[in-house]
Amino acid sequence: NYSELKNSMVEADPEIIIHMAAQPLVRKSYTYPLETFNTNIVGTANVLDAARSCKSVKAILNITTDKCYENNEDGRTFKETDALGGHDPYSSSKACSELVTDSYRKSYFENVSVGIATARAGNVIGGGDWSEDRLIPDVIRQIYEGHKLKIRNPNAIRPWQHVFEPILGYLILIEKLYENCKEHSTSYNFGPEETNVLTVKQILDLAKKSLNQVDYEIDQNNDMHEAKLLMLDIKKAKQKLSWKPKMSMDKTLFSTLSWYSSYYESKAIFDYSKEAVEEFINGEN
C-alpha cells in the first residue's frame, strides 16, 4: 500500500532508511513469480518514491543479494561492476531492484545530498532464521522436530557467513553514506573469506560433527534451476569501508547451532543472543 507507506514514512521523518523487505526465496519465486516481482521491484520503487517526500532523509541503503549478478557458471568471483541478471524470478527481481535504485539515485537524489547505496551479501546463517528452504533451519527442523531433510544441490558452492558479518558492514556503510554521500553512493559486496566458500555437503558434514544427528536424502525431483557456484569479491568493502569478515566457518557454524540448541533447551534466548552480539562486537571470535 503505497499511500500508507508514504504517510508512515513522512510521519516517522527518518534520516536513515534501510530497505530489507523482500520475497527472499528462490523456489517460492518459481511458484509465485508475480508476487516476487511485485514485492522486490515495485516494493523497492515504493520505498524510494516515498523517501522523496521526506526532507529529513540523508542516507538510504537497499539490501539486495549476491544472486543479482548474471551467473554463467564460469567460476567468476563477482565484483560490483559485473553485469546484473538472473535466471530465476527471485534473482532477476533483485537485479531489477538494483536498477530501480540506481535510477532513483540519478533521477531524484543526486542533487539533493542524499546518499543511496546497495548491499549484496552472500548466504547468511545465524540463530533465529526459521525460513523455509534454508539449509540450517531445515537441518534444525530435522533434528528437533523430526522433519525430513531433503537436499536439492549438495555440490552447490555458496559464500557462507554469519549474519552478524554483513550487518556490521551495513552499519559501517550507512554511517559512511551519511557522512559522505557522493563517495559511497554505490554498490558493495559483503561476503566471507575464501575459506568460508564451501559446498552444501561440506556444511552438512561440519554440522554432523557438532550434532551427530544430521540425516538427509537427495531430492531427485528437483528440476528448478539454481546457481551451482556463487562467490563474491569483497576487496571494495575492505578498502573503502575498512570492513572485513571476522568469523571462521567453524565459529560461524558453532555460533549458529548453539543458538538453536539453546532455543530448544528453553534457555533464556534473549540473553543468549545479547551475549553473542557482544562477543562478536568485542572481537571474541
Question: What are the roles of these predicted feature ranges?
Answer:
Residues Y69-D74, Y108-V114, D129, Y144, ...:
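Proline-centered turn/helix-capping motifs that create local helix->coil transitions or kinks
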Residues N1-A121, I125, S258, Y272, ...:
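N-terminal Rossmann-like NAD(P)+-binding domain of SDR-like oxidoreductases, especially those catalyzing
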Residues G85-S93, S97, E132-I136, P159-V163:
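The catalytic Tyr-centered alpha-helix of NAD(P)H-dependent dehydrogenases
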Residues V47, Y104, D138-I143, G169-L173:
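A short, amphipathic alpha-helix embedded in the catalytic core of nucleotide-handling enzymes
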Residues N123, I143-N285:
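C-terminal substrate-binding subdomain of Rossmann-fold SDR/epimerase-dehydratase oxidoreductases
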Residues S3, E15, R27, L34, ...:
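Residues in well-ordered alpha-helical elements
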Residues T31-E35, A51, D74-F78, S131-L135, ...:
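Short, glycine/charged-enriched secondary-structure capping and boundary segments
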